[in-house]
Amino acid sequence: MISPQELIERITSAANYHDCIVIVREKTQANLRWANSTLTTNGVIAERSVTVIAFVEVEGGMASGGVSRTDVAAHEIESVVKEAELAARGAGQAPDASELAKNISVGSWSEKHQATGPDVFARIAPALGDMFTRSNADSIELFGYAEHSHISTWVGSKGGLRLRWDQPVGRLEMTGKSHERSRSTWEGVPTRDFSNVSIPDVDAIIRKRLQWQGKKIEIPAGRYDTVAPSGCVSDLLIYMFWSSAARDAYEGQSVFAGKDGAKTRIGEKLSNHSVNLYSDASYKGLESIPFISATSSGPMSSVFDNGLAQTRTNWLTDGSLTALAQTRASARDTELSFTPIGDNLIMEVPGASGSLEDLVSGVKDGLLLTTLWYIRQVDPATLLLTGLTRDGVYRVKDGEVIGAVNNFRWNESPVDLLSRMKTVGTTQITQPREWADDMDRVAMPPVVFENFNMSTVSKAN
């Protein structure tokens, strides 16, 4: 197999058109999986992806087109270079054409991919075995997995881009069931190297929540003050983040479209708290790729922006919308700043403090969630979402959990929820559940939302 660096050099040398950008990603992933409190599988996988993007001069301007492969062998280089050129010429003049970045170097270009492996689980594996033993003794069934990935990205071009980034990421997800599976709960822990993962803590949380479910309380659909753990908050705001393309707003096709003659809602107060929502490639513990590496163009990305820096973008400042996701092309059209979408998402409220337990203790009458799932969009104009609660909804009275209630289908807009935050806790790096496969670097606080709409009772368990 040709090294990523050599492959990029060969492809860009063979490209006899205006410019050529090659993006190579190498990924290794180690995993442990278990069911019924028994380890079922473990292993390591290795993957490579290669994207070749051609930039070709055509009548009226510049065209771009790309092809992606799981790998490119030496004898395939000429054909993949030609395929990219044909894709560009077939696409015609690119509406997002911009001047290409050149002669930028980032990272240790020449180093090999540092593969992850089973050793990353050395510290937690014995503790997992102990947890399985205890759970079997207490008739608790455990299901879940631990996985750790290491992704190396190289971006190179004819124009002198030589960019490299290494991204470690991991997570542990655990579902616990008891009493003939009539009780079920979940816990997830994000990590970069498993040094922060405490299996005894996960065990204690699962046992406590299963115990809470010993008392069942049936309640009707309605609006309830609802304590959302940081993971639930992240699943809601990630969807909002993905819906924040400036061009869509400018064209009146999103919740961020302007009113009363304004093209967008930038500058509008969206929250009743001084919310700061931002992406920052250097955020401690959530470090992410500091340059753009788009394999295709769309509302939020442009291959013409590849190689440009991603630093910090403030999406909300003091509760007001301050930016929407932009390419350079959309920034020109909307006459707004170039604010590329980031690879992490952080929400903070200055002065807010308190753990999830602290927020629960302050609720007189409400609900406590575990997770949200099956989240789908109902109305893009308001970003109304629907979904189900999962793995435990608890009744809170006078600051204490008094039992478990039935599940619900809910209907809410994360944009609207920003203005109905009763209490906000301390921001922490957290584990989304619904979107964890797509967005794995998030820091959010737990939040008490006022009058959260539990629209119908769900029979889901």
Show the residue positions of the predicted features:
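Active-site bordering "gate/hinge" segments
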Residues: 1-302, 317-318, 400, 427, ...
